[in-house]
C-alpha cells in the first residue's frame, strides 16, 4: 500500500514515514540511521551494520527478513529499508525489489498475483499485501496435549485443515518420523509467539488477516472477499457472475459488489436450503440474518477493539457461522474451528486465540450451539465462570424449555416448575388419530428461512410438509368461488389495510380506535365516494378475508388496535415456505426437555426477590430458591395475578401487561372413513369456507388437510364466534361443523367422522389463551416492557415478550434463548 505508492523506479527525495507522511530524506540522513555495532569477534576488528525497523513502536531491535527471495537478501543484516508487517515479521528492501521491480525475477509472480487480487478484491494489491498473502510462513500448533507449542513452517509448506488437526512438532509433509528422531517438542518455542498475545501487538499489524479457503466462501461469493475477511487470491473466494436479477434495489455498501455484479446466494453443498445466515448485497428484511461485512451493535459493544478495523472479527465470525450451519447436529467448539483458520504469519496465532472468545460470545447469544443440541455429561458450552449460577424457570412451554436447555448446556443449575401434568404449554399434540398427528395448539411454521424451528427439525431429522398457496373458496351450497372474484376482493381488502396504514402515521396513542371500526369506516367511505356497489358474494368473500385477519390477530377486530395491530411488521420477519410440522411440535418440545430437571404439577404461587436469592413458592407450599428466576407463563396468567410478586411488579410493567390482549383461537379436528373432499379440492392443502354473513365469519373459515394420505381435516373458530363455543358442548360444535361441511360438499354424501376433538383453551386454568395481540390504545412497546428484567434477578420470556415475533412458537422459543443470554451475562 504505502510501499507501492511511496517508492517508484525513479528515486525521489521524498520518502514516507511509518505513518505514511512524506519526509524529506538525503543520503546523509540515511547514513545516520545506519548504526555500527561490534561483530561476533571480541577484539572488535570487524563491524556489522544493521538498521532498525522504522515503524514507530515496533519492538524488533534486529529485524530478520522472512522472505529470503533475493540472492542479496539482507537476512538479519543491513538493508536500506525494512518493511514492517508485524512486530515479528519484516522483509528487506532487496526482497521488496525482487518482486516489485519489473526487471527482477520475482516480478512476474507478483504481477500475476496482482491481477487476481485486482479482479476479485477491493483493497489495494500492494507489495505488503502480496508478502502477507503469499510469502509469510504459516504457523501451526502442536496437537500433543502436553506440548501445544507453536512452530513456524518452512515457506514451501502449505497449511491445510488436516495438517492443523494432526501436526506434531518436527512433522513434515509426506515423511515418517524415525524412532531415533529427537523429541522436537522439547525445543523451546519462538519468543515472538509470546508477543502475539500482548495487547499492543495487534494494533501494530499492517495487513489484516484474510482467511484462505474459508468454509464461508460459497455463502459470500457476492461480496468482495477482502471486505468479509477472506483472501481474494483463493479460487474459492472468486466472485460469482450474475445469474439472476436482484429482488431489491439500492446502492452497494463498501463491502459489496456493485448491484450489476451481485450474485444470488449459493449454498454450501449439503446445507439445508432454509439456512441463509448472511444477507446478500442489497438484501434486507430477512430475520436472523447478519451482514457479513459489518459488525452488529452488540458485537461492537463486546469487542470494541475491532471497531476501527473489523476484518479479523468478521473473518472469524463468518467462519464460525458457516461451520455451524454446515453441521448443526454437533456442538461447535474452538477445536473444530481452528483447523479452518488458514492464514499466513504470526497473526494465525492471534486468530486462534480470538476464535475462542468470539465463539463463546456467539454461543451465549444463541447464534450457534442452540436448538435441541445436547452436550455430554460434564461438558459445557461456556467456560467455568458461567457455571456458578442457579436458575428457576417457571413454565415448561417453548420459552421455558428453550431457556432451560440453553442454561443447562451453559453449565448452570436449572430447575423447571410446570403447573400442568405435562410439558409444552400451548404446544399439545393429539397422537390418537390414525396415522396423523394433529396439534391442539400450533402446528404450522410461518416462514422457514433461518427459522429456529427449521434448525431444530434439521437437528432431529424431521421433515416439514410445504403448504401450497392455492385455497379455493367454497360457498355454502357447494359452488367454488370464481378466482377473479376472490382476487378482486383480496385486492380491496389489502387496499383497506393500506388506508389504515396511512391514517395511523400521524396518530398518537390516545387517537387510536379499534381496527374493525376503522375498516368499516373506510369501507363505507369508499363505497359512498366511488359509487361502486359490491355484490352479495363479493361482500361474503370480504368477510372471509376479515375472518383470516381475526385468525392472525387472535381476536375480534373490534378489540384490536388500528394503530398497532401489525406492529411487528416493522421488523425483519421470517421469509420462505409455510410448512406443516407433520410430527407435531411436541417432538421438538420433548427433545428440548430431555435431561432437564422438570417438576410437573408445581403451580407457582409467589416469587419473592427481596433477598440475596429468589424464593419461589408453589401452591402446595413447597419452597424453591435460586439466584435467578425466569417467568414464562402465558400473558393471561400474568393478567390474572395468579403469581404474587414481592415486591409487586411496577406500575409500568403492569400497564404494559394489561395493554395487550389474551387472544383466543379454538380448533376442531375430524377423522373420516375416506377423503370425500378430494374430487373438489384436487390436492390443495386447504380450502376456505365463504361465510353467508358477517355474524358467521369466524366459524370454520379454513379447513386444513392434515395429511395427503389420511382422512383428517382441521379447522379453527376465531373472532367473535369463539364466544359461542362457551354455550355448546363438543358434540354440538361437531354438529355445527358437519353442517357447514355438508353445505360445502352438498353434491355428495358426507360420512360421520370416526374421531374428533374440540379444544377449550379459554378454560385451561394455567393457559387461558392462544396468543397475544395489541389492544386499542396499546402499542408494540408493551412487549419490550414486559420483557425487561427486574434487578438482574427476575426475568421474563414467552411470545408476549417478543416484540419482533409475537404469537408464534418461534417467538416464544427465541424469547427463551434471549433471556438465557441475559441471565448468563448478569
Curated annotation (Swiss-Prot):
Keyword Cell inner membrane: no
Phenotype reported upon loss of the gene: No effect on mouse development and oogenesis, but embryos derived from oocytes from Kdm1b-deficient females die before mid-gestation.
Chief location bin: nucleus
Annotated Gene Ontology cellular component terms: nucleoplasm; nucleosome; nucleus
Region (Disordered): 1-46
Cofactor remark: Binds 3 Zn(2+) ions per subunit.
Gene Ontology annotations of biological process type: epigenetic programing of female pronucleus; genomic imprinting
Binding site for Zn(2+) 3: 142, 147, 169, 185
Record function comment: Histone demethylase that demethylates 'Lys-4' of histone H3, a specific tag for epigenetic transcriptional activation, thereby acting as a corepressor. Required for de novo DNA methylation of a subset of imprinted genes during oogenesis. Acts by oxidizing the substrate by FAD to generate the corresponding imine that is subsequently hydrolyzed. Demethylates both mono- and di-methylated 'Lys-4' of histone H3.
Protein's name according to its UniProt entry: Lysine-specific histone demethylase 1B
Amino acid at each position: 500500500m504505502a510501499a507501492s505508492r511511496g517508492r517508484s523506479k525513479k528515486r525521489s527525495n521524498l520518502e514516507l514515514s511509518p505513518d505514511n507522511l512524506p519526509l524529506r530524506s538525503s543520503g546523509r540522513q540515511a547514513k545516520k540511521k545506519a548504526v555500527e555495532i561490534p561483530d561476533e569477534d571480541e577484539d572488535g576488528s570487524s563491524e556489522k551494520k544493521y538498521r532498525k525497523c522504522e515503524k514507530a513502536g515496533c519492538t524488533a531491535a534486529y529485524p530478520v527478513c522472512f522472505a529470503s527471495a533475493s540472492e542479496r537478501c539482507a537476512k538479519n543484516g543491513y538493508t536500506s529499508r525494512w518493511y514492517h508487517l508485524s512486530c515479528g515479521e519484516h522483509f528487506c528492501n532487496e526482497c521488496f525489489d525482487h518482486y516489485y521491480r519489473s526487471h527482477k525475477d520475482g516480478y512476474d509472480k507478483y504481477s500475476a498475483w496482482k491481477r487476481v487480487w485486482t479482479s476479485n478484491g477491493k483493497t489495494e494489491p500492494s507489495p505488503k499485501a502480496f508478502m502477507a498473502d503469499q510469502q509469510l510462513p504459516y504457523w501451526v500448533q502442536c496437537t500433543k496435549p502436553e506440548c501445544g507449542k507453536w512452530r513456524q513452517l518452512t515457506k514451501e509448506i502449505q497449511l491445510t485443515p488436516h495438517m492443523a488437526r494432526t501436526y506434531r512438532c518436527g512433522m513434515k509433509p509426506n515423511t515418517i518420523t524415525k524412532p531415533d528422531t529427537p523429541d522436537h517438542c522439547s525445543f523451546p518455542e519462538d519468543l515472538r509467539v509470546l508477543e502475539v498475545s500482548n495487547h499492543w501487538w495487534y494494533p501494530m499489524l499492517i495487513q489484516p488477516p484474510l482467511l484462505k479457503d474459508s468454509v464461508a466462501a460459497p455463502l459470500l461469493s457476492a461480496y468482495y472477499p477482502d471486505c468479509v475477511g477472506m483472501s481474494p487470491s483463493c479460487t474459492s473466494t472468486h466472485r460469482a457472475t450474475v445469474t439472476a436479477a436482484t429482488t431489491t434495489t439500492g446502492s452497494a455498501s463498501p463491502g459489496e459488489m456493485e448491484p450489476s455484479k451481485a450474485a444470488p446466494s449459493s449454498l454450501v453443498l449439503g446445507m439445508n436450503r432454509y439456512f441463509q445466515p448472511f444477507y446478500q448485497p442489497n438484501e434486507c428484511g430477512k430475520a436472523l440474518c447478519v451482514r457479513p461485512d459489518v459488525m452488529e451493535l452488540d458485537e461492537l459493544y463486546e469487542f470494541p477493539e475491532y471497531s476501527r478495523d473489523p476484518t479479523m472479527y468478521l473473518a472469524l465470525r463468518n467462519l464460525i457461522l458457516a461451520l455451524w450451519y454446515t453441521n448443526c447436529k454437533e456442538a461447535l467448539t474452538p477445536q473444530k474451528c481452528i483447523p479452518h483458520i488458514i492464514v499466513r504469519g504470526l497473526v494465525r496465532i492471534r486468530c486462534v486465540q480470538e476464535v475462542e472468545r468470539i465463539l463463546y460470545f456467539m454461543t451465549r447469544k444463541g447464534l450457534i450451539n442452540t436448538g435441541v443440541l445436547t452436550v455430554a455429561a460434564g461438558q459445557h458450552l461456556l467456560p467455568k465462570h458461567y457455571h456458578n449460577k442457579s436458575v428457576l424457570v417457571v413454565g415448561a412451554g417453548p420459552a421455558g424449555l428453550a431457556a432451560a436447555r440453553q442454561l443447562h448446556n451453559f453449565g448452570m443449575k436449572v430447575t423447571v416448575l410446570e403447573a400442568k401434568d405435562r410439558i409444552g404449554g400451548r404446544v399439545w399434540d393429539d397422537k390418537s388419530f390414525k396415522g396423523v398427528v394433529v396439534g391442539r395448539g400450533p402446528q404450522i411454521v410461518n416462514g422457514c428461512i433461518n427459522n429456529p424451528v427449521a434448525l431444530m427439525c434439521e437437528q432431529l431429522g424431521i421433515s416439514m410438509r410445504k403448504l401450497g398457496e392455492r385455497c379455493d373458496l367454497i360457498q355454502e351450497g357447494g359452488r367454488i368461488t370464481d378466482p377473479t372474484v376472490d382476487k378482486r376482493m383480496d385486492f380491496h381488502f389489502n387496499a383497506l389495510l393500506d388506508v389504515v396504514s396511512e391514517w395511523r402515521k400521524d396518530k398518537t396513542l390516545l387517537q387510536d380506535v379499534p381496527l374493525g371500526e376503522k375498516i368499516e369506516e373506510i369501507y363505507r367511505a369508499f363505497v359512498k365516494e366511488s359509487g361502486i356497489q359490491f355484490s352479495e358474494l363479493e361482500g361474503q368473500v370480504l368477510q372471509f378475508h376479515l375472518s383470516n385477519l381475526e385468525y392472525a390477530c387472535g381476536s375480534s377486530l373490534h378489540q384490536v388496535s388500528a394503530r398497532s395491530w401489525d406492529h411487528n411488521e416493522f421488523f425483519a420477519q421470517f421469509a420462505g415456505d409455510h410448512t406443516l410440522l407433520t410430527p407435531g411440535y411436541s417432538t421438538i418440545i420433548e427433545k428440548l426437555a430431555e435431561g432437564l430437571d422438570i417438576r410437573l404439577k408445581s403451580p407457582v404461587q409467589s416469587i419473592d426477590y427481596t433477598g440475596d436469592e429468589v424464593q419461589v413458592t408453589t401452591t402446595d407450599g413447597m419452597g424453591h430458591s435460586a439466584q435467578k428466576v425466569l417467568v414464562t407463563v402465558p400473558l393471561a396468567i400474568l393478567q390474572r395475578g395468579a403469581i404474587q410478586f414481592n415486591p409487586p411488579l411496577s406500575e409500568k410493567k403492569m400497564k404494559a401487561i394489561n395493554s395487550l390482549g389474551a387472544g383466543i383461537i379454538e380448533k376442531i379436528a375430524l377423522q373420516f372413513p375416506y377423503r370425500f373432499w378430494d374430487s373438489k379440492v384436487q390436492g390443495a392443502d386447504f380450502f376456505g369456507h365463504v361465510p353467508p354473513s358477517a355474524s358467521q365469519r369466524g366459524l370454520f373459515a379454513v379447513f386444513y388437510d392434515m395429511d395427503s394420505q389420511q382422512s383428517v381435516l382441521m379447522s379453527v373458530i376465531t373472532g367473535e364466534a369463539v364466544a359461542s363455543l362457551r354455550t355448546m358442548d363438543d358434540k354440538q360444535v361437531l354438529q355445527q361443523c358437519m353442517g357447514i361441511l355438508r353445505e360445502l360438499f352438498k353434491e355428495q354424501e358426507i360420512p360421520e367422522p370416526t374421531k374428533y376433538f374440540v379444544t377449550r383453551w379459554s378454560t385451561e386454568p394455567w393457559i387461558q389463551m392462544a396468543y397475544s395481540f395489541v389492544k386499542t390504545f396499546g402499542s408494540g412497546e408493551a412487549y419490550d416492557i414486559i420483557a425487561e428484567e427486574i434487578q438482574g434477578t427476575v426475568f421474563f420470556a414467552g411470545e408476549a415478550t417478543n416484540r419482533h415475533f409475537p404469537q408464534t412458537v418461534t417467538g416464544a422459543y427465541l424469547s427463551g434463548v434471549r433471556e438465557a443470554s441475559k441471565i448468563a451475562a448478569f
